[in-house]
């Protein structure tokens, strides 16, 4: 063993590098650990196990420095030594080499691997070597991360294959390489462990991009700044700065890709995908009530306002992601809010909450990153991989992540697969050391002493065994869509008591405090690995193993406009699952967990002269291997097909990849090397050796046992005697056999026995001995002393920590500056790309030649359209468009397009229509305001005048408003008194003047107020004021009042102030004036007749009585007694004569005719106003003003009269009689969408419990799509079926039918279930129709909306009654109703429609049907609906009274006219066909065709069909059946759920208001509405429309009324307000008489909320009239005014669905003859049977699902070979004698069914061939009796006539013919 000594000399124990060379007593883990410690402390961290294995201990410093600073004993030195020996064996023995790395995370495997790779590539330093090295760097960049134990933790298994040509030389030529990645740790992408990093590339791109690049990628924006923003997918911000040069790493990454021949544009695309992944992590989601109306909306009454959806908060980040993915931001948001799963073989769309949307976004991020890694690796392989036929030998470097006790990311699957790989790699090691060549040794008769060791075969078999290993079982359970508990049970059955390495916990456990077993939420299984026992949680493991990529994401990507994204999702790494019936439809997918290629040793062709087993190149490229059979196949289940790769889960794929690795490792002609990497301590402390830590690892890997084995046998080469002697160059003169010659050579060499053994035909020899005998030892000796200047790598001295900067050690760095062969960018690296060019690429903007983000977003929103229809606008539409443009011409298109963000022309047109409608509405409101407010003011302007009585009255009514008159002007002295304290009088004394004329208290100085004719008046002139007290009322104070002296400042007083009165009046007028004294014209005329000089001038009253009588002159200025008359006549005589003439009532014309100078006229006018003014003419009682006054009153009375009529209409009294039992057949339809189980059960149970004959009511539930609503744990279909008791095993075939959708969405598929539902003693037949969608539908399959759910039944009944071809689904519905339930569909006369969240009263159906029977002209009716959740919130409280009044006033009033304009779909019943004639009514052709309108592309049609489909259906009934009535039945009652949030309530009322407007517009032109003039329904409709659009003005008008009443106290406004109050009083009378006392409180709340109902809601509704989801269909204008409908949904061919009954019956017949007849899909029984018997309670033969039939007049031929089935099936009637006595069954659209004698059922089928059916016979009998003479007709005569008409013998049908004839003649039919 001396040859194993180190070159370091003989200094001590540490000088021994070989552990097996140590003495036997040191061959224990403790002693070996001590020996490693002694070497570690002298900088020798390595030790040899044999020539093909060594141990390396991570020093956490330099990996290239050994003892004395040289390579000897260092990790790099040992790695290069192993690489040299592998290369020699590769060249000289043409063997495949495999190097396997074992070690825990942080032990330095990645570094040692890089050293070995560098050393191997140094052997052939070529441009290809550079690319191979670059490929390794790129792989590490994408798959390594920083963990708590190491900065370069590999998180993907690596199988790196170097491909050589060794056929022609012993110096192998590198011709290619192949990267095989195994199972990337995808959970880390979105769940970064605390204190660790994500994959390095994500940090690189964030740090290494330039400013321009950051802006493009969305990193440099203020809200996305890298400095202050925390990136969800990058962990804690401290991880951005952990000593790793991320910026340099990114530049190296880009350079590596360029040198690997990736185009610059593709590198930029890769960076965009990486950026989008980071941005996906930033998306924040919230729940939002989506109030935007879509055509596929469905659900109950509470869903009308909108449904809860999940939306992105940060729309800017969403836009960035969408732009980089090349999709629409809206579609991306929708896709993230939904997720399609496969549950029980059905595709179901789950409506996600914010947490679910976040998980969905994480799935998208993981998918993108996984596909990107696969794409880059596959493209690298395409660049560097050699053709398989050229490959002779390979060197495989195998490095899987180390064993781990727990998952840092929380992923049980990643932990399981990672540890399974570690277990497999360790098992390979054990087999190589202990079991390999065992057979050959035995054949060669060589005995080797056995060595005991820990064998992990149990764990390996338990985990990896094909078929029934743990991973295979997990994969099988995933493919079977089993639950976690079912997986646990399968593991228990497989391993319990059978495999000691795997233990399974109990599936059930007792919870604390409970004695009952419940599901064990902590269930797990335990695996005893070679490195320890690990417990794996079972929770979520099956789903995680599926790694299902939702079909929604794939559907989204299918629409991408990015070629790179399309290539990314188009690669083979994405395994898709297609629909079995439509292979082009991808339902889901998964990213491969195994490499896309296989090892070359497994896949290449056999070369001449070699014995290597290979596969075809085609298999290599695809990388697909035949999958393993599942456990079911071992059980003999031959019905299950062999699993396909696309259906494999992660565990199955990973198992296959491990199998490939294992097989390639064990392949013939493969030599294995092993590198054991150990950690010196657990704390990553440099140069510290923890003996316990190392000893544990030694024990884990069984180093001591391996060393013992090597001491016994260290063989790696087997040489036949001849080859051995050839290498030994034995002297030919030596005599003896080959064996003897070999023995002689061995004796001469003196090799240890553990390194050489002689067999019977050859020699087992160690690699060291082989190299010696082959004289190759010199090629690997002395290499450690090479100085750096002679070819050493200057970067090789970098410590392990250097990998923080470059991920891999310097020796493997593609950026080495070596000038010798060890460098890849040295002188020998010539690949045509200079570093300068690469640097320029990295330093600039890589996106400058690509589209901007805005351009990407715009391209992502584009749609590929196809024309599906061509049409022309109607004349009315053209007129409306013209009006719209006339009203909105001033708004330019570019503003709507850019500012309004409406790129589509039809959306812009709808906005214009909305604006035009709003203009019309606002104009109507303004017109109403003008008529009711402005018009009266214009006709009779407001006068601020007061009569004397009013002045006095105000004083009496309101003390605070104390008014007084001064010279014809009225002032508020009540405000003056407190504001101006009087020092000489008390305030109470002043109040005596309130309501009086106090002009006498204020004497005036005449000369100060009038200039006369000369320009001045003598100051001594006095003129008394003529008061207006003509009624002798004590409200006038004269100048004799004592207080007048305080205001007398005339000329003759001691205190003269001529201007005091003028100044005082100016102040008074500005502050306290309220108006003027008013004199009606008749009063003025009366005063003039009393010899008063009084007249009207310009609407003002002037009095010259005192002036004409003569004034006075103050005595102080006139000395004589005579008065100078000239001083007193200061007024112009012509003016005075005006007041003396005969026509003195109005002298304005005479005044205008006076010839006065302007100065004199102005002077006279001033005198008139100041001295003679009495007041204004009071015109308030004139004819014009009375008209204006009573006009308002008349309008108010008209409006109130309508409400009063509604009140009287609501007064419907009578006894609460219970209707008798009725025998009419009714259907009860319930459309279901995403309601919860409580709502659905309430609706279904209430319908089933209705007090109506159970046999005569059919419960129909239509499920709109396969959707799981938020808060539900099952799809709606499953909830409904569970309520009805249908087993999960029932799975009918989906059948096609026509739906209401765009393009190809018109083709839908559905399933039909039927059976009996038993609840509280009721046994009710039911029919469930679920719309599952075509196979190509991924998101919300089958969902088309509530209107489509109604159309499913309406169209079916329409085709039944009109004898039209049916779709396959409708044929199946017919079969289920007729043959399984046992009722002919034509018998159903009425349909009750209720919503899924509505509960109906028990007597509802009876009351409805009674109304229909009482009035045969009644086509539809509705009942009263109350709120079930009245007290949920204030929003629901304010709706209670409104609901009550809207039914009991509005609908009751409309019911008087027989024209209820809105029959709510939540609770209404319709007449299907006329009672007398059988004519279809509710399902008539006109109604169905109009209601099934698909092209809903205008604002009007969207408001009709998307907002108020129920109201529009009522409109159609009134329009096409105008002779029939619609009524309100107030005694029929139901309860529903009302919106309890403001947003949903607002949206719901928007829908109601807008649909009301548009439906009333449809009704107004109808001329058939009842009665005439103002008593007509048309007038009421017009008033309703008008009141709807002017509601905002109405509330404003009421406010105006209140204000006017408070301020003016006029009689008329008070009366109008009293009338309004009386109206609400009438409403109160209604609920008082009905003892609804609680309505008092609800009414008060409603009145408080009136501004909301009448003002806020209408304004919001009118402006949001175009708030729709416009879908993908639009209208484009073509040539000559033609318009075309285009859509991206494809073109639908209606002929592809309908099918003739003959075809369907023929198919069913063929199917029946080929297999056994099955029972009902739901229960297996026919109706009214409670046991699986073939005879019903009526004695008829049992019906079978395949015995389909229709009436003869429904398309079935009169003569058919399948008539027997028609006869037998027709006997399966729901009622026999009861139906015969029901009456009114005969109809040209359907006949009855009759009992047949027992012998009829026993006749041979051959005798019945070609006979007519019962229905055909019945129809002909009815026709014969209609025209025959009933006095002479006989049964025999009827039979003979039938035989003549049908042309067949009917003896066998005599009994039926006789019974039918009797029934018709007796009136039973």
UniProtKB/Swiss-Prot annotation:
- Report whether RNA-binding shows up as a keyword of the record: no
The entry's function note states:
Polymerizes chitin, a structural polymer of the cell wall and septum, by transferring the sugar moiety of UDP-GlcNAc to the non-reducing end of the growing chitin polymer. Involved in mycelial growth.
SMART domains the UniProt entry points to: MYSc
> Pfam families under this entry?
Chitin_synth_2, DEK_C, Myosin_head
What is the membrane topology noted in the UniProt record heading this document?
A: Multi-pass membrane protein
Q: Which terms in the GO cellular component ontology are assigned?
A: cell septum; cell tip; myosin complex; plasma membrane
Task: Give the record's keywords alphabetically.
Answer: Actin-binding, ATP-binding, Cell membrane, Glycoprotein, Glycosyltransferase, Membrane, Motor protein, Myosin, Nucleotide-binding, Transferase, Transmembrane, Transmembrane helix
Query: Which family is this protein grouped under?
Result: In the N-terminal section; belongs to the TRAFAC class myosin-kinesin ATPase superfamily. Myosin family.
Subcellular location per UniProt equals:
Cell membrane; Cell septum; Cell tip
Question: What domain of life?
Answer: Eukaryota
Recorded domain comment? The N-terminal myosin motor-like domain (MMD) does not seem to have motor activity but is indispensable for polarized cell wall synthesis via binding to actin that ensures the proper localization to the hyphal tips and septation sites near actin structures.
- Domain DEK-C positions: 1811-1866
> What processes does the entry annotate via GO biological process terms?
chitin biosynthetic process; fungal-type cell wall organization
Descriptive protein name: Chitin synthase csm1
Species: Pyricularia grisea (Crabgrass-specific blast fungus)
This entry's Gene Ontology molecular function terms read: actin binding; ATP binding; chitin synthase activity; cytoskeletal motor activity
Cite the binding residues for ATP: 103-110
Polar residues composition bias: residue spans:
583-593
Task: Look up the EC number in the record and give it.
Answer: 2.4.1.16
Which InterPro entries does UniProt cross-reference here?
Answer: Chitin_synth, Cyt_B5-like_heme/steroid_sf, DEK_C, Kinesin_motor_dom_sf, Myosin_head_motor_dom-like, MYSc_Myo17, Nucleotide-diphossugar_trans, P-loop_NTPase
Q: Which ranges carry the Myosin motor domain?
A: 1-778
Q: What is its main location?
A: membrane
Q: Which gene encodes it?
A: csm1
Going by the record, the broad EC class of this enzyme is transferase
| Segments passing through the bilayer | 880-900, 919-939, 1191-1211, 1579-1599, 1612-1632, 1639-1659
- What ranges does the record give for the region Disordered, renumbered to this chain? 579-653
